[in-house]
């Protein structure tokens, strides 16, 4: 009986030891949940991203020593070095390395000369394993920022129920069946201080300026003040829709 008990305790102990390294494996997709939570408060989108960014998602594979991230407009490929005293170093071609560590259930990107300290959570979004880098963050952001039911208060389709889906579809908004939020890059440069999104119906689409204030979402035509040979500089024109989020 004592031998059986001893063997059982040994098995439990060894099992615990064997599983310990798995808890230190940072493989997987990590998203900037802090940026999403800030955006979900219903204010300016890019302000929330900039305040908690700049990086939005990490995709890490310790087996292949790959660690890639996106900041919303570029994908950066890195090489993951073995853990050293709780720190994983990621090296990049032509750029300074970045250090990562774990703090509880968070992946921490250590502050550097180029970037502030950032925290990331494992993505719970269910997507295909080959989903493009950044897709997990975008799905989670769209659900948090534009999820739920909206009602057209004014504009074409007044009274319609509008739904923005996480995969980029929009239902109930006349003249559009797909949308994309501008997170960073050229679209952000073109819209300057304003938040913008792309609305599309089948093959035809256009940029729009939007203003989010709590439960209200205003969508405006995007007018261009730039000269023909300059990068577009968008600003809000006529308001096309006023939407209100339903409780």
Model regions and ranges:
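Positively charged n-region of N-terminal signal peptides that target proteins for export
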Residues: 1-4
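Edge beta-strand at a domain terminus
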Residues: 112-147, 178-179, 224-247
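Contiguous, well-ordered beta-strand patches that form the walls/edges
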Residues: 36-44, 50-106, 154-160, 170-247
């Amino acid at each position: 009986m004592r031998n059986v008990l001893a063997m059982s305790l040994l098995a439990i102990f060894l099992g615990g030891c064997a599983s310990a390294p798995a808890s230190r494996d940072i493989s997987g997709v990590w998203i900037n949940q802090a940026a999403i939570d800030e955006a979900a408060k219903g204010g300016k989108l890019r302000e929330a991203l900039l305040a908690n960014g700049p990086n939005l998602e990490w995709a890490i594979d310790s087996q292949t020593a790959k660690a890639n991230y996106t900041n919303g407009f570029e994908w950066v490929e890195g090489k993951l070095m073995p853990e050293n005293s709780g720190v994983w170093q990621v090296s990049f071609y032509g750029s300074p390395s970045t250090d990562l560590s774990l703090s509880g259930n968070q992946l921490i990107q250590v502050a550097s000369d180029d970037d502030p300290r950032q925290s990331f959570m494992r993505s719970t979004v269910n997507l295909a394993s080959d989903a493009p880098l950044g897709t997990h963050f975008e799905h989670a952001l769209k659900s948090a920022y534009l999820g739920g039911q909206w009602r057209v208060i004014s504009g074409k389709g007044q009274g319609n129920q509008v739904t923005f889906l996480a995969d980029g579809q929009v239902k109930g908004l006349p003249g559009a069946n797909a949308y994309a939020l501008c997170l960073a890059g050229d679209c952000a440069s073109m819209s300057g201080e304003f938040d913008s999104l792309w609305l599309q119906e089948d093959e035809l689409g256009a940029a729009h300026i939007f203003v989010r204030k709590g439960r209200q979402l205003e969508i405006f035509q995007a007018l261009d003040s730039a000269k023909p040979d300059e990068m577009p500089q968008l600003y809000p024109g006529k308001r096309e829709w006023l939407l209100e989020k339903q409780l």
